[in-house]
Regions:
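Conserved beta-loop-beta/alpha segment of the NTase-like Rossmann-fold superfamily
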Residues: 64-112
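Short catalytic helix/loop segments, enriched in acidic residues and glycine
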Residues: 11-29
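Short, small-residue-biased leader/transition segments that mark boundaries at the very start
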Residues: 1-7
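Conserved N-terminal catalytic core of the sugar/cofactor nucleotidyltransferase
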Residues: 23-77, 81-82
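Short glycine-rich anion-binding loops that position phosphate/pyrophosphate groups of nucleotides
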Residues: 3, 55-56, 85-88, 171
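Phosphate-binding/catalytic loops
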Residues: 91-182
Length: 182
């Protein structure tokens, strides 16, 4: 998940990872459907649909649910959501097979709309908000130069984790990615 209005901001990690995959695997945009841009291609020998909800971040569940229903995607076995996580250090990624929203309103809406917490997610660390900052100001801010390199690497690692999930399975991707330190 992300927002076209937050390009290169910490709240846009999902979109940045999708852009990385689009470029790396030459996946063309197929169009706009259900308030989401999407493209179809092949990654790790598997057919994929990459999508970017065009809704507000906190309403990402609608486009995800509608796209999953239309393309007959089983959220519990065929969906991967990539998003920012303030509980992880900048540059760190963490893959989980299920779990709560952890305070992320976009994920909360996806869980609500899908009716399950059981879907694969790749969290990209953006770091905790600085003391005295509003959370919204933090996630909508640009990265410090010192963190930008780490975050760019994490975006690539998140994209590469998608390929590993598709070619070797989620456990292999989790074993490799969850143990990496930025």
């Amino acid at each position: 998940v992300g927002s076209e209005m937050c390009i290169r901001d910490s709240h846009n990690m999902g979109f940045d990872a999708i852009d990385y995959l689009i470029e790396k695997y030459n996946i063309p945009q197929a169009g706009v459907k259900f308030n989401a841009m999407y493209g179809k291609g092949v990654i790790g020998g598997e057919k994929v649909i990459l999508m970017k909800p065009l809704s507000f971040m906190n309403l990402s569940g609608g486009p995800v649910q509608e796209m999953a229903n239309y393309f007959k995607v089983d959220p519990e076995t065929e969906l991967v959501v990539i998003y920012d996580d303030i509980d992880l250090d900048p540059g760190q990624i963490r893959i989980r097979k299920q779990g709560s929203a952890g305070g992320h309103n976009g994920i909360k809406d996806i869980i609500r709309r899908l009716g399950t917490e059981k879907f694969l997610r790749i969290k990209v660390g953006v770091g905790a908000k600085p003391k005295g900052w509003d959370l919204a100001d933090h996630v909508l801010s640009r990265f410090a130069d010192s963190d930008r390199r780490l975050v760019d690497e994490a975006i690539e690692n998140a994209g590469d984790a998608v390929e590993k999930i598709l070619s070797q399975g989620p456990d292999a991707a989790m074993n490799e990615s969850n143990s990496k330190k930025p």
